[in-house]
Each structure stands twice: as C-alpha cells, then as structure tokens.
C-alpha cells in the first residue's frame, strides 16, 4: 500500500464540491479489513455525515472493503447496481443512518457513473433503497458518447 499514487481522492473531492459537501477526512489503508473498519468508524467519530470507500472492489474479488463495511455493523442495502459504469457499487447505512458507500474504480475515470446518480439523493438526505437502485436499471447503461451530455441524456432516466 502506498506504492500506487492516489488519483481517486481528487475525483471524489471534485464531485463533492458540486454539492457543496466538505470532505472532513481522508484515510489511506492497505487491504486489511480491521484497518478499513477502524478508518470508517474513525471518520464517523470525527463527524462525517457520509463515508466513501474506494479501492479495488470492481477488479479484486478478494477486496476487503465490503467485509470491512459490513463489520462496522452497517446495514447493506446492496452490493451491486444495474448500472454501467458502476455495477460493483456498494451502498449501506450505519445504525444512525450515515451512508457508507463502496465505490468501484470506474468513478475515477468515467464522467457519469452510479455514484453520480446516487450522490444527489444522499446529499439531499434521501435514503436510497434497494428499489431505487433497481429502478436505475432503466437507463442504467452509459453509452460513453464521444461528447458527454450527462445529465441531459438517457443515462439514469430511471432515477
């Protein structure tokens, strides 16, 4: 861990800025379930109202992030969404309602992903349900147009 330059965090910070969300902390962990669980709980303790985990969830079947999120006691809404890019998205809520999301790598490089469909609702304080995620399957395939017009396109129309 620490051998690969973190290019994910700047992308998340920019997406958060669009909704005037302040990033109150950033913790880098290796793929260790206990450390990830501890980091999530530490961010919650610092007052985080939303927690975003990034890592190898979309490419590494042994990634520890989903298990670490579950180990916090979070209620898993879904680990997977009928949306491309973003099929390996994980959504959960801590006991007090704080959303904890596990983001697949596509969020780092694709302009529009499942995170872009979910983030506005989370930012507005709306709890996203399994049914909401299922509805995202209608228009859930980003065509990757040469010139992106999201949100003025068919992507996410089921939201």
Region spans (language model):
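Short catalytic-loop micro-motif centered on adjacent basic/acidic residues
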Residues: 23-26, 52-53, 102
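Glycine-rich phosphate-binding loop
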Residues: 38-90
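Short, solvent-exposed amphipathic alpha-helical segments in soluble enzyme
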Residues: 6-12, 41-42, 67-71, 116-120
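Flexible glycine/proline-rich
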Residues: 68, 72-159
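Short N-terminal signal/transit or membrane-insertion segments
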Residues: 28-37, 151-159
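Gly/Ser/Thr-rich loops at beta-strand to alpha-helix junctions
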Residues: 1, 56-60, 105-109
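Short acidic (Asp/Glu) and glycine-rich catalytic loops that position anionic groups and cofactors
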Residues: 19-20, 48, 96-99
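Glycine-rich phosphate/diphosphate-binding loop of Rossmann-like nucleotide-binding domains
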Residues: 1-31, 35
């Amino acid at each position: 861990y620490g051998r690969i330059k973190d290019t994910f965090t700047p992308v998340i910070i920019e997406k958060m800025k669009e909704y005037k969300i302040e990033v109150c902390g950033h913790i880098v962990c290796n793929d260790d379930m206990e450390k990830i669980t501890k980091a999530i709980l530490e961010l919650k303790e610092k007052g985080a109202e939303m927690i975003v985990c990034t890592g190898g969830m979309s490419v590494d079947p042994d990634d520890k992030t989903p298990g670490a999120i579950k180990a916090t006691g979070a209620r898993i809404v879904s680990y997977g969404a009928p949306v491309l890019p973003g099929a390996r998205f994980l959504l959960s809520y801590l006991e007090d309602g704080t959303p904890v999301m596990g983001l697949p790598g596509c969020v780092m490089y694709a302009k529009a992903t499942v995170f872009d469909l979910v983030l506005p609702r989370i930012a507005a304080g709306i709890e996203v349900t399994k049914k909401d995620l299922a509805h995202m399957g209608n228009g859930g395939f980003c065509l990757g147009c040469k010139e992106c017009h999201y949100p003025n396109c068919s992507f996410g129309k089921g939201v």
